[in-house]
Amino acid sequence: MAIPYRTRQRLKRLGTLGLALIVLFLFSWLCWVIWVERYIIYTEDGAVIDFDLNPQIPMGEVAQRPVPGEGPEIHYNEGENAVNTSTDLLQMSGYYVSYDLLKEDFDNVKAKILSLPTNTPVMIDVKGGHGFYYSSELSDAVINNSVDNAAIDELIKAMRQKNLYLIARFPAFQDYHYGLNHVPSGIPFTGGGGALWMDDDRCYWLKPKDSGTIGYLTSIILELRGMGFNEVVLDKFWVPTGTKVNYTGDPIEDLTECANRLLSNVSTNSFTLSFTVSSPSFVLPEGRCRMYLNNIPARDVEMTASQTTLTEPQIKLVFIADSMDTRFDSYGVLRTIDLLDSD
């Protein structure tokens, strides 16, 4: 039986429409897969999707390990021209150099640093949540190539040769690569089935009390100490909060234990381990350490100092300042190197 012409035309149109719908579905599915990929978190147990992630991927995350034997030179200066390493901590007044300045204005920053007098305290960022800025030789180190790593190595060497008081700063628990490769050491997110919580910088956070975390931080601090740094500041020394953060321990107790164990691991009579904390009421370990505070207005300096439990706040309390306001000068203060006029 022959199919009528009109029926054939109708079937042809239906077939064309069906094919178009199939193509549209496949295209939409492909676009969805590409879009959702940015929200996937990989764990040891598989992958999960978290739509609360910030889709912005930090620039400069490309990383590679250094060539063996070409890492930072380890230097011990015990001569008469060495930096003052007496057992007594002194009140600090100096400058700090952020990652942004190292990345965007390196030559100007280097010139300013090398114009400073001997023993001036200078703090530089040596690592971020996405890798090391200098050529670390640690087995777990991932180098962040968003800055000139060789230039950072040379800057550290030049600062040491000029006998500045060298301070290294890096985030204590914010570490994407270590968290990715050591999931049990990371802080999980609520309802994630073991997947790790990730912050707006797309970094995982480590548990302060975890033995792997403490061992990892100890190795970094010891490497920096061996490179000639007089002090290391553990930045962001706190536990993140929020409904998505599944942290079951007591943050204050765990941070206190972590600080004490780290100081015990790296302590010498001339090396200082310090902590940037979220509250001035945090109790520091006994020994050579300082408390650093960010974003404190000059008008609140005295009130903030009164909230600490420090026996010598003028020495053990350091404010990170972006102004020349003299109200900071009663205590330790590090000002951005931007405030230093070029010669």
Question: Where would I find each of the regions flagged by the language model?
Answer:
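Active-site-adjacent "subsite" loops/lids of carbohydrate-active enzymes
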Residues: 83-100, 173-222
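N-terminal Lys/Arg-rich, disordered targeting/topogenic segments
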Residues: 1-14
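Catalytic domains of carbohydrate-active enzymes, especially glycoside hydrolases
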Residues: 107-132, 223-235, 288-292
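Aromatic-lined carbohydrate-recognition surfaces of secreted/lumenal glycan-active proteins
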Residues: 96, 165-175, 233-235, 252-295, ...
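Hydrophobic membrane-insertion alpha-helices, especially the h-region
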Residues: 15-33
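Glycine-rich, aromatic-flanked loop segments that form ligand/cofactor-binding clefts
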Residues: 121-123, 147, 151-197
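Aromatic-lined substrate-binding rim segments of carbohydrate-active enzymes
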Residues: 75-79, 128-171, 241-270
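Substrate-binding cleft of secreted/luminal carbohydrate-active enzymes
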Residues: 32-40, 46, 50, 288-343
